[in-house]
Amino acid sequence: MKTSLLIAGSLALVPMTYAQDKPNIIIILADDLGFSDLGCFGGEIHTPVLDKLAKNGVRMTQMYNSARSCPSRANLLTGLYPHQTGLGHMDGSHPAWPKGYSGFRSNSDNVTIAEVLKDAGYFTAMSGKWHLGNKSNPILRGFQEYYGLLGGF
């Protein structure tokens, strides 16, 4: 009986051993957040939980926010410049922009970090606003779970 429990207990730990081979990855994108708004970057605002995540994880200190909102999301999810992703500006409703000027259609040929991580055996999930165009959605772009708004409202 003790031997059976020992073997069963040991086998139960095998998945945990493999799970530790891959680190957890959490990417946080916050609109309108300045680099010095967080305590871990010298900000005055007390952010202990985010500071702890930064201390025990990787802080990206060389990221350039190329544009607001949608283009930055596309940039972060694909590693491409916003115009390469098809999201070079916010939307096509501005009257001064030439007709047919692309910029608010996420290019489905671009590989997302979620697709790469999913193929590597990670479970991928996203929460929040997608805001990457009307024809795309997170489930079709590599996220296995999604809870949030597709638009930017």
Report the location of each language-model feature.
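Formylglycine-dependent sulfatase
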Residues: K2-S4, Y18-F153
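Sec-dependent N-terminal signal peptides
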Residues: T3-P15
